[in-house]
Amino acid sequence: MTEVQEEKDYKLAIEAFNLVYNALDKKAREKFRSRARDMVEEIYTSGFIPTLFYIISKAGLENNNDKLTALLNSPSSKSIDLGSSDEASYMAYLFVILYYLSERNIINKEFLINKLKNNRLELIDKLYELSPIISARIKRYLMAIKRLAEALIEVR
């Protein structure tokens, strides 16, 4: 990866972190910090797709899909409240992944949002197809998210 790509990944990590930080309350931020610490490791032990399945299963999309799509569509998260539940922290981590994929043009944002709303299985199938590319490119970004969470979210 070139130095320019690395810088773009770090910049995207800061943007995504800022969006989820503002969309979560204090309790959910603490839970998100745990997700950021654990999920990056899980992706590289179990693989991207199995970990993604787990994250999706925990994100509560059946009740909160509109919040996730609003966050993906929004240039700012000021008016979006993901809540304080465990689901909110998983949804925030799912957002971080999907934000990277759309902003780095690995997957089209309109396709992503459409499939989140209408056909998650088709989205998962597309992500499975792209998983070798995703796995090779996303690690630095997720490590930056992890470090930001560790540095900026205090846990009692």
From Swiss-Prot:
GO terms for biological process: defense response to virus. It is found in: Cytoplasm. Disulfide bonds: none annotated. It comes from the Archaea. InterPro entries: AF1862-like_dom_sf (IPR023101), CRISPR-assoc_prot_Cmr5 (IPR010160). GO terms for cellular component: cytoplasm. Belongs to the CRISPR system Cmr5 family. CRISPR (clustered regularly interspaced short palindromic repeat) is an adaptive immune system that provides protection against mobile genetic elements (viruses, transposable elements and conjugative plasmids). CRISPR clusters contain spacers, sequences complementary to antecedent mobile elements, and target invading nucleic acids. CRISPR clusters are transcribed and processed into CRISPR RNA (crRNA). The CMR complex degrades RNA complementary to the crRNA (target RNA) within UA dinucleotides, generating 3'-OH and 5'-phosphate ends. Part of the CMR ribonucleoprotein complex, consisting of crRNA plus Cmr1/Cmr2/Cmr3/Cmr4/Cmr5/Cmr6 at 1:1 and possibly 3 Cmr7 dimers. A Cmr2/Cmr3/Cmr7 subcomplex without crRNA can also be isolated. It does not cleave target RNA. This is CRISPR system CMR subunit Cmr5. It comes from Saccharolobus solfataricus (strain ATCC 35092 / DSM 1617 / JCM 11322 / P2).
